[in-house]
């Protein structure tokens, strides 16, 4: 159960992280 909602959150975080990484570069 915890991994289920965690996977959904991780997917969103991954998208946001990609944007942050491009800004840092």
Swiss-Prot record:
GO function term, MF aspect, one: structural constituent of ribosome
UniProt keyword terms in alphabetical order: Ribonucleoprotein, Ribosomal protein
Pfam families: Ribosomal_L41
Renumbered residue ranges of the record's region Disordered: 1-25
Keyword Ribosomal protein: yes
Keyword Iron among record annotations: no
GO cellular component, one term: ribosome
GO annotation, biological process: translation
Quaternary data: Component of the small ribosomal subunit.
Additional note from the record: Initially thought to be part of the large ribosomal subunit. Crystal structures show eS32/eL41 to be a small ribosomal subunit forming a bridge at the interface of the 2 subunits.
Sequence similarity: Belongs to the eukaryotic ribosomal protein eS32 family.
Protein name: Small ribosomal subunit protein eS32
